[in-house]
Amino acid sequence: MASTGVYPPQSDTYLLARTLLGEPIEPGTRVLDIGAGTGYLSVSAALAGSRNVTAVDVAKRALLNTRLNATLNGVQIRAVHGDLTNPLGENNFDLVVSNPPYVPAAGDTLPTGGLARCWDAGRDGRAHLDRICREAPRILAPGGVLLLLQSALSNIDATQRELQRQGLTAEIVSTAQIPFGPVLTERASLLRQRGLLAPGEDREKLVVFRAVKPSGAA
């Protein structure tokens, strides 16, 4: 269930959920969902067996939606208000999932409210991706896994480099090609001007990175 003003589950959500369910999830697996939205991924992890799921979102409305969906599905989720990983401690999570905003925007000023906050990610689409890549080693337990979804429009190679720079091993484990939704349809002209889209291109490539913190890392 998606409440008014909360990003509803879409193709990117489902791609990441399928990838998440390919990971070993046990009752003691500590799972974190960054940018939880409706809580679809958090609920998926809890239904898969984790009894220790944390959902974080900057929007209080999203956290209410997450709590509601947890109740409707008979699972318990700790919903935390905060900006990405800021409210979280160190080395706490075995599995981190995130479907952050990743759509390149006209400028670098990020929305502070409204649905656009769910997809606008600065001029290069990397405002949130780069932060998650940099902060993941701090919140992951040794041997922990990050599953991070993004669009090819927001520079796949940059994510690979940044994850490796942070000492994580990283690879793409899931991909999908999806038709443009309303946001990319409206923004296609701008993205073509920047050389991010070819003339007539109307499908978006999505990828999921799987990044692992070494078992011996602090």
Predicted regions and their residues:
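A short helix->loop->beta-strand "cap" motif at the edges of active sites that frequently abuts
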Residues: 50-51, 144
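Conserved SAM-binding strand-loop segment of SAM-dependent methyltransferases
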Residues: 74-84
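Conserved SAM-binding motif I beta-strand of class I
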Residues: 52-57
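Conserved SAM-binding loop
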Residues: 66-67
